[in-house]
């Protein structure tokens, strides 16, 4: 049990024990080191012929555990002895509590509780008196400020935020005086702030004007992803939710989705109404040469009638006879004879009847081990209908199948030629396909045994004996198993400490007969295998005497697999070039001898050769444990071991992500294609929680006296150590978990004494077994609580175990009465459980205010500020975790029902170390918890080499990353709330700037920590030794979150103020879209200078928002380095592939294209008719999905809303002064709140230089295009005011909603709202759903004389709609348009008379009118003219990649269509990547860059 420092006024237990010691001198008799009990030496006057049995006193040692372990004298001081303090292990000084002291301890706890309540009442009274005495009405708003809210803290040592930030630790005697002084200062500050409310403030703590502002996080940061097969809710803490809070991103994505629909129409016209010269039959006939058998058949096996209407049927290249595309030579002679032997040829294994129905084999997107070559060219057709049956007739295929080929995985004849992996609702893959992941293959020299299960279908039934026989072949030899287990408990066990080490080893010994596995205990209490006794013999038999032993076997397999993956040699090699040295941390290899390093290298090389295949776990959980039934419909066999296996299984699914597909493809658990943030983990955790309730883990084991009587009875059953049947009278749960712990003691005692329980030694061992069982009970429960908190933080979902103390009274593991002298590492585990639970309470306080609807709907600013300050104190080490939790409770931020009352027994000295101390521990050779005093050389020699200390420090490192990620999230929420308010309330600019700087600092901190982790995972004996698999995804996820904010700032730095969707940018920080060569030359020069500075950039330093023009370049360098990192990690981790693709995509978007190179080809950066990108037409779209799927996307819903087609006179409701024609409500639409124009926090006074340059560039562009300059345009526009044109066609909506071909065929002409209404009140932006308005009222050319000139200034999309309003003659199928001087067009039509709408550029229209030449519309021209977003130039080729390509309408609405933005689906083809949920978030969060707003001419009219 952890000890609490006792007050001097209260008699301590130490003084009570010392008095008892003085009365009992015999208690100081020397005892055997490491023994749990000590015996009294008999008096000298006693007769030596005494026949009495020596009895050992049941005495608890008085010395601390560390001194007893070191065998030094302990002064028994509380809470920490002098010996532990000198040697730097005061945080581990632990005393076993006396049984008679329990009552005294309870009294002390009551006194401490009453003391805290009195102090809290006093703080509340002072707060109320302050409120009533305040003269102004603003006092009701100011008493909840971060300064005044600290009055709720009561007697907390750090009662003020000033003391917390400075890190001062004052004594209790000075605390009262400091509190009074602070109250006086706060009163003076309140009066001064009320008198100067409008004065500018440079600190958040000074201004209390906005402290009571309410934030509604339920609307701004909440997502609902609607899939075709389910719905997923994502809360504010999910990494995807950042897109909903940023106005820049909302506008960006609204434009992206509208542009996507336009390009889909362009592709549809191009592909549907032009000759498909490149179309070929999907069957590659070159690979199917003619044969005599197929000479009579002239018909292609492809059903050409199934092609979409309007598409030209594939033309047969030659009249050669057709042949089945299957290479029959690959089959055995028993199935299909060679081609020459046609007389006895049997039936082809391909079921050709499926082809006649239009069924085609699925697209082979990923290489399959079954396919020998690409026999079918699936890229030449667009059909992909749902397929529920394999085209191969397996009845004929499996007939006369050679039995000797069943075990040959290398023979291609033993596999079906069809790749079943991409077929929906088909049988599971054979086991051999699951072991083809190249990321975890062993190094050279590793064994490559072929297992029977790899050639057996797992959907077939297997008996238990067959499964055990297969597992015997899959498991490594006995010696290797023992080494793996020791490695796990030495390096990985602190990450999932829910096992009893000795108990688990005994069970493994029983199952696998590892009689030589008895460990040799070293000086540090760590069990090390003896290589001399272990034999390198394989596993020949697996004994499962009890049902629960199957779960132990499953845990063993997970340990073997996870430890093998975590070997440092298996980690991914990361080389970041010159920047690698910045992220290296010192390791401790220099402290190890050469022999120790050599021995470690030999062990690792031996372990690398023996990989446990993932199929072993699949067989165990499916056929032995039957986990699907246990976790869904039955709880008859649920016990503690079952819960332990479920926890290990969930832990393995999150850590070894590359094995997820393998584990779930053959399991009918509803967890298809699970991901790190998918719903599968939620369902599994809910099952684990319910099983824990079923076992009673939520109640403390001390509440059940029958445990004391049941557990000792199991010693008989285990003492026989070979019994196959358990005692039916004993509890199977207790029998499984605690029986093995008493094996040795029971075997030493006589059988009669063991049965009667009269042997004192046996009785003592039984008591120890009971305590260890209760200890495991408590560890499992609190680990489940921690899993619940982590899942809620990751997914943004509500916690399952809310208000823990309302239904659970389970004590912390520190309450277990266990002597840790033989197992010091278990003492560290116990300390960590207490510390981590306290950190979880801090996280719970944040989650309650963000995720709980009742609080998140009206959370106040000062509450978030208080959370930020307390988390800062925790991560910076200025305040102890006990004080932070107490402050949260006293301020009302954390209810006591969450478990805060358990903290009264915790050691104050065992807290979270500072992050620099964790990283620099190896360099300074100091303990993490050094008290600051100089230690002598003798003390250093005596200091313990603590077990798995590096793993514990790695866990501390991950806790720091989690806390700082929360700080980043809280600051980002406040930043996005106050930034748009700057145009209306200038006082919020300072708040937004400070929150943005804090968010950037913590984002860069997470970015650096991510780089530090991956740069040190392969170092020998480093901080992250054996933690490469467990911490890889959390670290990469935090780095990815930081990258999202980087992109947000890059967009602000390059685009300047957000002026609206139909307005020109007031000013820009980056390169403008003009033609001023001097401005361009200066930009190039500045860019070169900034690039030279970036070479000297220190990635370990924070980035300042006031960096000016170099801010975007500095942040871009971070993105490039992260892209380089993820590219190297993609070789090992699948989730790194997604992040690398998205990061690389946005890097290309952020890369500003060179105007000089563009202008050379056509003389204009907007007229590049000859420019062609080599892969534009072949890029697969990120936004590839049909309209129904698109509307389910949470990004689409947030940006556009659910909008249905409306009438011609309908419009949006008036929003913020915008007067629009039409009704105030839209049928079937969702009105979203508008986004106001505002300046970003990156806007500085140095941007004024760009104003005149932008105006000159715009004037030159107008002179180039139109031949005149509007001299009346006012370029000197005040900041924060949008330019308001006079009249005429000054600005049109850049993105008009899509129109279907049916509308054109029906004669409905899209129109645009009245221009006078559009251009009025330009200070406020329209609502987002106006982007998809389908009715656009264009001015009539016959009534407006300025129409001919205005049409030239319209966007290409508007021109497309204008061209649709002309006479369309019927001619050819090429879709070309002939422009005339009047602005009308003659457009070709298809054979059926459908009207065509082409995308014509305004420059093309102008050229056609002057030269009377035919202009062919070009997609690249369209893209180049619409690649400017608020001054940010976007790479047009990347734009195509964002918006996507043509979607075949025949594939729209299919039931098996891939969900748009699937959360758990990742598919990569040869060219691009299909968007997944993770990728699109990066595209949303970072795709700011892909926002392609069409070019606006705001002041171009008269």
UniProtKB/Swiss-Prot annotation:
HRM repeats lie at residues 280-285, 299-304, 323-328, 347-352, 389-394, 415-420, 1192-1197. SUPFAM superfamilies: Leucine zipper domain (SSF57959), Zn2/Cys6 DNA-binding domain (SSF57701). Zn(2+) 1 binds at residues 64, 67, 74, 81. The keyword Nucleotide-binding does not apply. It is found in: Nucleus. Residues 244-444 are annotated as: Heme-responsive. Binds DNA as a homodimer. Interacts with SRO9 and YDJ1. In the absence of heme, binds to at least four cellular proteins, including YDJ1 and SRO9, forming a high-molecular-weight complex (HMC) which results in repression of its activity and dictates its DNA-binding specificity. This is Heme-responsive zinc finger transcription factor HAP1. It comes from Saccharomyces cerevisiae (strain ATCC 204508 / S288c). The lineage of its organism: Eukaryota, Fungi, Dikarya, Ascomycota, Saccharomycotina.
